[in-house]
């Protein structure tokens, strides 16, 4: 079934988002487990720490989105990579905006 329980409420997903999120989590965990990718993630951390994480992430989102249906055919891994780099971009966004968003939240909810 396409539902889950959140805050004691039943929610029906229209586009199987719950399954997609589970699949994405498995994909991400596998990328961390793969030996050859340990250096890749170390490089990604250096890029993010160097202040270039957003451009790097957006560039990879575009790369894999454009590649879908071409280089490897309709490879679901290209879509999972788009989502993973989107999460990295969200992480970078949150790092760069954490203080201002926290202050904005406090002012809206006080």
Language-model segments: which ranges?
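Intrinsically disordered, low-complexity regulatory regions
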Residues: 2-110
């Amino acid at each position: 079934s396409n539902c889950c329980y959140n805050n004691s409420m039943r929610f029906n997903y229209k586009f199987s988002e719950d399954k997609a999120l589970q699949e994405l989590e498995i994909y991400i965990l596998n990328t961390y487990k793969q030996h050859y990718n340990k250096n890749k993630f170390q490089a990604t951390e250096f890029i993010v720490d160097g202040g270039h994480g957003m451009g790097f992430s957006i560039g990879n989102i575009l790369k894999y989105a454009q590649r879908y249906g071409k280089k490897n055919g309709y490879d679901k891994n290209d879509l999972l990579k788009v989502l993973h780099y989107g999460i990295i971009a969200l992480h970078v966004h949150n790092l760069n905006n954490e203080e201002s968003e926290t202050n904005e939240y406090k002012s809206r909810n006080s």
